[in-house]
């Protein structure tokens, strides 16, 4: 029994110690707020010195390392620097785009933020002592620069080709009704007096004169097609002295291809240009026909008897007279002449074909020089004719023929 009592007494002492240790501290009772778990909330205050610490105790918290100090120093230096001025954003303004009567159409446009100071800074970087070339320019780049300098010198020596400027567009008042005005977009004609002079100079050419006199029905060269020739001269962009006879026929062929689209009329141009060679074809066919009929019926009869003569070679050799032998000997000669005429005709036909191909090739280059603009408006044709209305070319009207 004594042992059990001593055990219970020891247990009571231990429980008493535990209860005394769990009693709340008087300082913790003064805190007004408590957590839900029963433990007091701790307040952490940064940058606050609690007083001098003991000599062996480090006052800095363990979580603040050397990297944290560097960050603090960098943040302090950045605060001391003046704030960098930001580039102002481009402003937007409203600009008048079109004025139609009492109505005005506005267009939103941004104002550039480039100032004269930026140009000065850029020019200062291009000082004589500063090398503006980047360090990564290699030997290949030097070769390219040398080649570029040589090409520029060669271009300066060669005469520059004058390109035809594109036609500008303007707005013309088409109708005015009260306070309302109807506008119409219209292209400004690029035909200059130089082009009219070049056209008049080509009309004095004897070949072109014969061509206009040859086209009596005006199927290929009426006044509208000839006015299109002047318009094409202005669009091609060549100097006025450079236009020759072939350019007149190239422009006229393009005009017929654009307006008429008649193969017969275009073939008439080829027939007139190459009629010296083409006119010989019927002359070649005529002697061919004459030589075909030059063999008399008796010679044809002897020719049909050739298989029979072969069968009866010995008898026919005696029966045939010298005249039949003479007709038979003429057959190879006729074949030879017919073959020669056929070859001569084919060579001339090939020559004509090659000339037509060359003409079509030059027509394509002329069309590309006009920037592929072959359509001419009726207003532009009227302006071209109004430049010199008394010219004899404008009297070539198909309506006057009927």
Swiss-Prot record:
InterPro entries, per database record: Speedy
Report the coiled-coil segments: none
Biased composition regions of type Acidic residues, renumbered to the chain:
76-89
* Residue numbers spanned by region Disordered: 1-89
GO MF annotations for this entry?
Answer: protein kinase binding
Q: Where is the composition biased (Polar residues)?
A: 16-39
Domain of life where this protein originates = Eukaryota
Q: Which family does it belong to?
A: Belongs to the Speedy/Ringo family.
Q: Which PANTHER family match?
A: WBSCR19-LIKE PROTEIN
The identity of this protein, by name, is Speedy protein E2B
What species does this protein belong to?
Answer: Homo sapiens (Human)
- The gene designation is SPDYE2B
């Amino acid at each position: 029994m004594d042992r059990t009592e001593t055990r219970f007494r020891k247990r009571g002492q231990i429980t008493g110690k535990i209860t005394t240790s769990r009693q709340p501290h008087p300082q913790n009772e003064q805190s007004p707020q408590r957590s839900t778990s029963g433990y007091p909330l701790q307040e952490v205050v940064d940058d606050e010195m609690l007083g001098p610490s003991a000599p062996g105790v480090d006052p800095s918290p363990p979580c603040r390392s050397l990297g944290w100090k560097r960050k603090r120093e960098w943040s302090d230096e950045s605060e001391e620097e003046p704030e960098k001025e930001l580039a102002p954003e481009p402003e937007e303004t409203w600009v008048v785009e079109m004025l139609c009567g009492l109505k005005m159409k506005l267009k939103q446009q941004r104002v550039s933020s480039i100032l004269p100071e930026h140009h000065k800074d850029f020019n200062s970087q291009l000082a004589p002592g500063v090398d503006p070339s980047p360090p990564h320019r290699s030997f290949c780049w030097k070769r390219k620069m040398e080649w570029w300098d040589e090409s520029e010198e060669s271009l300066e020596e060669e005469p520059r080709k004058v390109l035809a400027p594109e036609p500008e567009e303007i707005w013309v008042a088409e109708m005015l009704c009260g306070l309302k005005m109807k506008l119409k977009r219209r292209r400004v004609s690029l035909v200059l007096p130089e082009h009219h002079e070049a056209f008049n100079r080509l009309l004095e050419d004897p070949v072109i004169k014969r061509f206009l006199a040859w086209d009596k029905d005006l199927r290929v060269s009426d006044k509208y097609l000839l006015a299109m020739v002047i318009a094409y001269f202005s669009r091609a962009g060549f100097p006025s002295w450079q236009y020759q006879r072939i350019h007149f026929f190239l422009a006229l062929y393009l005009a017929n291809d654009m307006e008429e689209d008649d193969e017969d009329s275009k073939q008439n141009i080829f027939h007139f240009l190459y009629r010296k060679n083409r006119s010989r074809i019927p002359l070649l066919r005529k002697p061919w026909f004459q030589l075909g009929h030059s063999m008399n019926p008796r010679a044809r009869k002897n020719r049909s008897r050739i298989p029979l003569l072969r069968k009866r070679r010995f008898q026919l050799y005696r029966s045939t007279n010298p005249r039949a032998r003479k007709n038979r000997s003429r057959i190879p000669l006729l074949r030879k002449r017919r073959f020669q005429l056929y070859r001569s005709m084919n060579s001339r036909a090939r020559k004509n074909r090659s000339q037509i191909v060359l003409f079509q090739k030059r027509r394509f280059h002329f069309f590309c020089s006009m920037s592929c603009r072959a359509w001419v408006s009726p207003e532009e044709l009227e302006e071209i004719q109004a430049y010199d209305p008394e010219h004899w070319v404008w009297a070539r009207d198909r309506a006057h023929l009927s």
